Amino acid sequence: MTEMFKERLADVIRRPLITEKATKGLDINQYTFEVDHRAAKPDIKAAVEKLFDVKVIGISTMNPPRRSRRVGRFSGKRAQVKKAIVRLAEGNSIQLFPDSES
């Protein structure tokens, strides 16, 4: 685990990604998260296991290229993101959608 995230594992995971492709992965116990672009696989594994109390058996990460963004005559780049697909052990799950009993 890198020294950067040793103190605060909650800073590793930014948010879960809820897309059509990511939702299909839920059937086979795969969850997709947007993570800090400096996080390594051991950091992501430690953060998911500690925050959600589950057992991680595999992680795939990808760094898509940054996209250009233009507002008027000013151009810039969007923030760099890293996607992590986390595979959980059999019998473990993360509740992404809270049950609404209203």
Swiss-Prot record:
The keyword Ribosomal protein applies. SUPFAM superfamilies: Ribosomal proteins S24e, L23 and L15e. Keywords: Ribonucleoprotein, Ribosomal protein, RNA-binding, rRNA-binding. InterPro entries: Nucleotide-bd_a/b_plait_sf (IPR012677), Ribosomal_uL23-like (IPR013025), Ribosomal_uL23/eL15/eS24_sf (IPR012678), Ribosomal_uL23_CS (IPR001014). Belongs to the universal ribosomal protein uL23 family. It comes from the Bacteria. It holds the Pfam family Ribosomal_L23. GO terms for cellular component: ribonucleoprotein complex; ribosome. The keyword Ribosomal protein applies. PROSITE patterns: RIBOSOMAL_L23 (PS00050). One of its GO terms (biological process) is translation. GO terms for molecular function: rRNA binding; structural constituent of ribosome. This is Large ribosomal subunit protein uL23. Part of the 50S ribosomal subunit. Contacts protein L29, and trigger factor when it is bound to the ribosome. PANTHER family: 60S RIBOSOMAL PROTEIN L23A. One of the early assembly proteins it binds 23S rRNA. One of the proteins that surrounds the polypeptide exit tunnel on the outside of the ribosome. Forms the main docking site for trigger factor binding to the ribosome.
